[in-house]
């Protein structure tokens, strides 16, 4: 454990947060609004989703994505046909050395939780605009808001209070208690980190701390932190320019005059040289599966269905890898359709490189259920009102996600 520190929630912030029902997402625009003073911006709305906290605030409706909700994006046209019927998630011949997790924003925080807690299963992680393990600590949503980039200052930069020291202390303790897998598993594992220099939602310092944390435990890290990107998942199929903030939070960036492909970068780290990306019609199948058999329920702010992409070769019995892909807040299927699944740019590589991709899905929820109006994955303990074990193997939502991995891999 290294030295570090935490600034507890200041009285002024507590005062600001006292009328939690005053926080609302502007459903008439895809972009953030900018109130005076401390700007209650996208980190609150996206990475944490506190709108209406404690009082059943409205979850964003279809208007939040404006007319783009009706667009037919290019990636959708070339992807495997969209899922129409709900089936049962199947087991495939998965190579245990090729099981990975990836996520953006709330899904990035959740990906770190899954990777750290189940490091004997996951052999690598790709994290976009997430943060250190157990970043929210025991303080729930308010702690997440104060310490993990939840408020944006007048300088348009997310505020930040480091949780690195507390994170590593908790991680070490839980590893010794065996509530998570041994931390020694992280040594040598490939980890990809993405942080845009223009990110107003998750402070780049949070991702710098995550880089330090993974380095501390001996992971092999590639840190992409030089692109002038706003908050979002980067891929050639992203419909937003690199520096644009807005729904569906899927951006495309360029490097040396060419379109960049962050997914190619981390898949190469994980798998070695790749077969070419399929930019045409995919041979694999995109299908919906029943999440409820794994314990998904409105009480965990989880949808009844998720999506899975299965390359034809994997369906025919070839040995394949697995990617568990976790979306961010305001990227749930009920809000943006299949744009996360088709614009992430994973399926195109998975199709030619034998990777099954599982896309769990969340739903927005509010009191009397979990306060999660922006359909974030649980990285502060909202499940079942409050889950103190949210970052452990026994965490309620973590258990659901891992059960999906167990089904696909056949791992006990």
Give residue ranges: language-model regions.
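Short beta-strand element of the alpha/beta-hydrolase
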Residues: 318-330
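C-terminal motif of bacterial Sec signal peptides marking the signal peptidase cleavage site
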Residues: 49-52
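N-terminal cap/lid segment of alpha/beta-hydrolase-fold proteins
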Residues: 153-174, 273-317
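Alpha/beta-hydrolase active-site loop
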Residues: 77-93, 167, 171, 178, ...
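Bacterial signal peptide processing site
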Residues: 54-57
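Primarily recognizes the serine-hydrolase "nucleophile elbow" in alpha/beta-hydrolase
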Residues: 96-143, 177, 275
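The feature captures the conserved acid-bearing segment of alpha/beta-hydrolase catalytic domains
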Residues: 135-218, 266, 310, 315-316, ...
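Cap/lid segment of the alpha/beta-hydrolase catalytic domain
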Residues: 89, 138-151, 239, 243-246, ...
